[in-house]
Amino acid sequence: MKKRFLSVLLCASMAAASLAACSSGASSSATTAAPQTTAAQSETTAKAEETTAKAADTAGEKLVVGFAQIGQESGWRDAETLSIQTYASENGDKVELLFADAQQKQENQIKAIKNFIEQGVDVIGLAPVVETGWDQVFAEAQEAGIPIILLDRRADVSEDLYATFIGSDFIEEGKMAAKEMAKLIGEEGKIVELEGTVGASAATDRKTGFDDEIKASYPKIEIIASQTGDFTRAQGKEVMESFLKSNKDIKGVYAHNDDMALGAIEAIKEAGLKPGEDIKIVSIDGVRAIFEAMAAGEANCTVECNPLLGPLLFETAAKLKAGESVEKWVKSVDGVFTADMAAEALPNRKY
């Protein structure tokens, strides 16, 4: 029996019901997206349960996954954590989760991975806080025969050092956001950008996708300022306050996540302007709070990035333990929600 140095950090007060399906399926155009059904989400969970059960039966013991989470930077991140923990809790007869909260520090994630290796977990899961600086610890995991799953963010390492990446196409998210912004401001005007954590793949790619699409397709739109808000509401507000002091003719704000957009909304209101009207708001993630803002007329569009990745994480881990091959990129399902869709979609938002 392998020793376990970490306990599963499950919050009993967080009911599993809060993880009912709330993602959306990407449509053929960037302007509409039909919400993914509860049945589809249930099918994903059921498939994961079947796969993990099969792995447990074959090996004669539980599937043990060590997961190093970034921290609690946003509502989206909390929803992802709950998805992982809830799946582990509900399938405790088949899986065991060792969970580490890195508090937004890479050194803490590296320490957690080393501990997972020492404890001999079957699979390591990681949402890397930044892209670089992982080569050595990934090599240590590889030497120990423990595959690594990257969840929702990529790492800048050789592909042979990790098994798969589960997550969204961040560049495409940025492109979709650019198209929505262009529609909202009539394809011309000055806009500002609130970037995510410096060095994080989500921030890098969402900026690349958005900026490249604006430059290529909308020559009359100018990004006049772009600065990191570190994916937090507080920093988003602070940076937006600075933007407003320096620029009086901002027509739109693009935020790499909803939390920064919500901070920007506060700053715009305090400046005596109307967010959603005087300044258009486009962001990424799809958390409940941004739907509330859209329903109130204070935001205009969110590109959803599905955080309910727990079932996919464990299904993929089970396949790896069983020696099965997996895709190098397991894509999650995302979509676009505009303000006119918010009121109808809001009752179904659980994160």
Regions found by a protein language model. Name each.
Residues 54-57, 61, 194, 198-202, ...:
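Hinge/cleft segment of the Venus flytrap/periplasmic-binding protein
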Residues 58-59, 65, 109, 165-191, ...:
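Hydrophobic alpha-helical segments within soluble ligand-binding/sensing domains
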Residues 64-83, 87, 91, 98-115, ...:
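Extracytoplasmic "Venus flytrap"
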Residues 76-91, 173-177, 201-221, 235, ...:
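Short, solvent-exposed amphipathic alpha-helices that sit
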Residues 99-101, 157-180, 193-197, 226, ...:
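Short beta-strand elements at the ligand-binding edges of bilobed clamshell
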